[in-house]
C-alpha cells in the first residue's frame, strides 16, 4: 500500500535548506549537514534549523486543536453500541434457523421430483423399446404378408411374373426391411428380439437371394428397369457393396480368368498389350447397362440414375488386379530390367486408359484411393529395378574409367572411351528404354553422380606425370655433335604405365569442352521427362547442373598448364642445342653460315603436330593460347641460352685478344679463318641470328605474332646486335 505523504509547513525563503529533504526515504543527517556547509556556516545552519523547528511545533499544535472535538466525541458516540449488537443476535439466529429449514424442505422436494422424473424416463425408455419391438414385429409380419400374397399371386395369376412388378415388390420389401433393421438395431439386447431374429434372418436371405437373381436376370436380358429397381433396392437396404461384389464375382471374374493367360502373354512381346486391350473391352461391352443406370455414362439421364455405385472402381478393377496377381505373377518380376521396363510401361498405359473410362474425376479419385490400386502399384518393385540399372550403368562406366586412356569407338564425337561412356551413361538415364517417372529423383541423383565421378576421373588424370612423346623420337643431331639425348640416358623408356601423354591431355580437354557443350541438351531432355510428373522447380535442376558443369570446367586450367608445360619442355629440349653452335664453328674452318640450324625446325615440330593433328578438337582460341604460352616459356629459356652463348663467345674473344697482345706476335689470329675471312666468333653470331630469324618465321607460319611471344623481341634484338657487331668487324 502506498505511503501517505505528509505536507510540511512552508518556511521562509531565506532558509539554507529545502524542507522536502527531511521527507526523503534515503535522508541522512551527515550528508545533509555536509551539503549545507558547502553553502553557509554552521552557525547560520543552526539558526535556520531552530527557526524551522519552531514552525513545526506551531503547525503540530494547530493540527491537534483542529481535530480535538472529533477525538473527544469518539468515545461518546460508542456508548451503548454493545447492547444494540446483542439485541440483533437473537432475531438473526431465528432467521438462520428458518432459512436452514426452508433449504431442507426444498432439497427434499427436488429429490422427490428427480426420483419421479427418473422413473418417468425409465418408463418412457421401456415404452420406446416396446414400441420398437412392436414395430419390428409389425415390419416382419408386413414383409411376410407381402411375400405370402406375392406367392399366392404367382399361383393364381401370371401378371406377377412381370419383372417390373417383381422389382416394385422388392422395393416395397426393401423399404420395410430398412425400417425393420433400424428398429432391430435400436432394440438390441431385448429378449423378444432374439425370438424374432430367425424370422428376420429368413427375410434377409430371401431378399438377398431375390435381389441377386433379379439383378443377374436383368443384366442377362439387358432390362434397364429390372437393373434399376434392383440397384435402388440394394441402395435402400444399404447393401450397395453386395451388389458391386456380385457383379465382380459373376460378370468380371470369369471374363478376367478367360483373358489373363500366362502362356499367351509370354508367347509374344506384344501379347501383354493385346491382353490389356481385351480387358479394356470389358467395360464398353459388359458394363454399358450398369454405367447407364448408375450415371457412369455420358448418355445417362439425371432423373433415372441410381447414385451410390461405381462398378468400374469396386467391381471391375479389383478383379483385374486379382487376376494379374494370381495368374500372371511373372509380370512383376524385375530380374530382366528391359522386359520389366516394357511390362511396366505397357501396364501404366493400361491404367491410364482404364482411368479415362471412368465417368468423372471423382470416380478417378476413388479408383486411385482404392486398396487394389495401391496393391497393384506396390507390386512393381521399382527400387530393385533401379538397383539393377544402377549396376549396369555404374559398372560400364567404371570399366571405361579404369581403362581411361583408351580411344573412343569409331564414329564417337568424343576422343576417349571414358568420355564416350560417360555421355552414353547420362543419356541412358533419361532414355525411353530406362526412364520411369516414379524413379525421376533417383535418376537425377545418378546423373549428378556420373558427372561427379567423371570430374574425379579428370582430376586424377591431371596429376599423372606427363610422358614426353617427342623424347621418344630420335632427334636429328647437328653435324659434328653428339646426340643431345645421350645425357638423358633411358629417360624415354622409363615412362610408367600411369603416365599420360600430352595428346591424351588434349583429348581430355576436348572431351570436357564437348561434354559441357552438350549438357544444355541433356537439361532439356531432363525437363521434358520431369514435366511428365508435374515437376516445376526447374531452377534448382539448372543450378545443380551448372554446379557440375563448373566442377568440370575447373579442371581445364590445370590440364592446359600441363599441356603447355609439356610443349615447352619438348620445344626447349631442341632449342637448347644452341649450346652446340660454338663447337661447330670454333677451329673447324667451316663456311660462313647461310641457313638456320636444323634444331629450330625440330623444336617447333611438337607445336606443328599439335596444331595440325588436334586443331579441330579444341576451340581456336584455346589452341592459340597453348601455342603462345608454350612458345613464350621456351623462348624465354632460349633467350637465356643464346645470351649465355654470346657472352661466352665475347669472353673468349676478349681473352684471345689479350693473349695476342701479350705475345705481340704477328702470327695469324687463331680465331680467324685462313685468307682473312670471317672469324669463328662472328660465324657463331651469324648462325644464332639466322636461327632466331627462322624461329620467328616459323612462329608466324603457325598464325601467331612474334610480338605476342614473351622474350622474343628481346631475343631478336640480342642476335641482331651480335650480327651487326660481326658485320662491323669485317674489313
Curated annotation (Swiss-Prot):
GO terms for molecular function: protein-containing complex binding. The keyword Protein transport applies. Transmembrane segments: none annotated. It holds the Pfam family COG2_N. It is found in: Golgi apparatus membrane. One of its GO terms (cellular component) is Golgi membrane. Component of the conserved oligomeric Golgi complex which is composed of eight different subunits and is required for normal Golgi morphology and localization. Required for normal Golgi morphology and function. Belongs to the COG2 family. This is Conserved oligomeric Golgi complex subunit 2. It comes from Mus musculus (Mouse).
Amino acid at each position: 500500500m502506498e505511503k501517505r505523504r505528509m505536507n510540511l509547513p512552508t518556511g521562509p525563503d531565506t532558509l539554507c535548506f529545502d524542507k522536502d529533504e527531511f521527507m526523503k526515504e534515503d535522508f541522512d543527517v551527515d550528508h545533509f549537514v555536509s551539503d549545507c556547509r558547502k553553502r553557509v556556516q554552521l552557525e547560520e545552519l543552526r539558526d535556520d534549523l531552530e527557526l524551522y523547528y519552531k514552525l513545526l511545533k506551531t503547525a503540530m499544535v494547530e493540527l491537534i486543536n483542529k481535530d480535538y472535538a472529533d477525538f473527544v466525541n469518539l468515545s461518546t458516540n460508542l456508548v451503548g453500541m454493545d447492547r444494540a449488537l446483542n439485541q440483533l443476535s437473537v432475531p438473526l439466529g431465528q432467521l438462520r434457523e428458518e432459512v436452514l429449514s426452508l433449504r431442507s424442505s426444498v432439497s427434499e422436494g427436488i429429490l422427490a421430483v428427480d426420483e419421479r422424473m427418473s422413473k418417468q424416463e425409465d418408463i418412457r425408455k421401456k415404452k420406446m423399446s416396446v414400441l420398437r419391438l412392436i414395430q419390428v414385429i409389425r415390419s416382419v409380419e408386413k414383409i411376410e404378408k407381402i411375400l405370402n400374397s406375392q406367392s399366392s399371386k404367382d399361383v393364381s395369376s401370371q401378371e406377377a411374373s412381370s419383372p417390373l412388378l417383381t422389382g416394385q415388390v422388392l422395393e416395397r420389401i426393401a423399404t420395410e426391411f430398412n425400417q425393420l433393421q433400424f428398429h432391430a438395431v435400436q432394440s438390441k439386447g431385448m429378449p423378444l428380439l432374439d425370438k424374432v431374429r430367425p424370422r428376420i434372418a429368413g427375410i434377409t436371405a430371401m431378399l438377398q437371394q431375390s435381389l441377386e437373381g433379379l439383378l443377374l436376370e436383368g443384366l442377362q436380358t439387358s432390362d434397364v428397369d429390372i437393373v434399376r429397381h434392383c440397384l435402388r433396392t440394394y441402395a435402400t437396404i444399404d447393401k450397395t457393396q453386395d451388389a458391386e461384389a456380385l457383379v465382380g464375382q459373376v460378370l468380371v471374374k470369369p471374363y478376367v480368368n478367360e483373358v489373363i493367360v500366362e502362356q499367351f502373354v509370354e508367347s509374344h512381346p506384344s501379347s501383354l498389350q493385346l491382353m490389356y486391350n481385351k480387358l479394356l473391352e470389358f467395360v464398353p461391352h459388359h458394363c454399358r447397362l450398369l454405367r447407364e443406370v448408375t450415371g457412369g455414362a455420358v448418355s445417362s439421364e439425371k432423373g433415372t440414375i441410381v447414385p451410390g455405385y461405381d462398378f468400374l472402381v469396386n467391381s471391375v478393377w479389383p478383379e483385374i488386379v486379382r487376376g494379374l496377381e494370381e495368374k500372371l505373377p511373372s509380370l512383376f518380376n524385375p530380374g530382366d530390367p528391359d522386359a520389366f521396363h516394357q511390362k511396366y510401361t505397357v501396364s501404366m498405359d493400361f491404367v491410364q486408359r482404364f482411368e479415362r473410362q471412368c465417368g468423372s474425376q471423382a470416380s478417378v479419385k476413388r479408383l486411385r484411393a482404392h486398396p487394389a490400386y495401391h496393391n497393384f502399384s506396390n507390386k512393381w518393385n521399382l527400387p530393385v529395378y533401379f538397383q539393377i540399372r544402377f549396376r549396369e550403368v555404374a559398372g560400364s562406366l567404371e570399366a571405361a574409367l579404369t581403362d581411361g586412356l583408351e580411344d573412343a569407338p569409331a564414329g564417337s564425337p568424343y576422343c576417349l572411351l571414358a568420355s564416350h561412356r560417360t555421355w552414353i551413361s547420362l543419356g541412358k538415364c533419361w532414355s525411353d528404354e530406362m526412364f520411369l517417372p516414379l524413379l525421376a529423383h533417383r535418376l537425377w541423383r545418378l546423373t549428378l553422380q556420373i558427372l561427379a565421378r567423371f570430374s574425379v576421373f579428370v582430376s586424377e588424370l591431371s596429376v599423372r606425370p606427363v610422358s614426353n612423346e617427342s623424347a621418344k623420337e630420335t632427334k636429328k643431331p647437328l653435324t659434328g655433335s653428339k646426340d643431345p639425348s645421350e645425357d638423358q640416358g633411358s629417360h624415354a623408356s622409363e615412362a610408367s604405365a600411369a603416365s599420360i601423354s600430352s595428346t591424351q591431355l588434349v583429348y581430355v580437354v576436348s572431351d570436357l569442352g564437348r561434354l559441357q557443350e552438350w549438357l544444355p541438351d541433356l537439361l532439356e531432355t531432363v525437363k521434358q521427362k520431369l514435366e511428365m510428373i508435374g515437376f516445376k522447380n526447374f531452377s534448382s535442376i539448372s543450378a545443380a547442373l551448372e554446379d557440375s558443369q563448373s566442377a568440370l570446367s575447373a579442371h581445364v586450367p590445370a590440364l592446359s598448364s600441363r599441356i603447355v608445360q609439356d610443349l615447352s619442355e619438348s620445344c626447349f629440349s631442341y632449342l637448347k642445342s644452341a649450346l652446340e653452335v660454338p663447337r661447330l664453328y670454333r677451329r673447324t674452318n667451316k663456311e660462313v653460315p647461310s641457313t638456320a640450324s636444323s634444331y629450330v625446325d625440330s623444336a617447333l615440330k611438337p607445336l606443328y603436330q599439335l596444331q595440325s593433328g588436334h586443331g579441330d578438337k579444341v576451340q581456336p582460341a584455346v589452341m592459340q593460347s597453348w601455342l603462345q604460352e608454350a612458345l613464350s616459356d621456351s623462348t624465354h629459356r632460349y633467350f637465356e641460352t643464346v645470351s649465355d652463348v654470346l657472352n661466352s663467345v665475347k669472353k673468349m674473344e676478349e681473352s684471345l685478344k689479350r693473349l695476342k697482345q701479350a705475345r705481340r706476335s704477328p702470327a695469324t689470329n687463331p680465331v680467324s679463318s685462313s685468307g682473312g675471312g670471317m672469324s669463328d666468333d662472328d660465324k657463331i653470331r651469324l648462325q644464332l641470328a639466322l636461327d632466331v630469324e627462322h624461329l620467328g618465321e616459323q612462329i608466324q607460319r603457325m598464325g601467331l605474332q612474334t610480338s605476342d611471344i614473351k622474350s622474343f623481341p628481346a631475343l631478336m634484338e640480342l642476335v641482331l646486335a651480335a650480327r651487326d657487331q660481326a658485320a662491323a668487324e669485317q674489313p
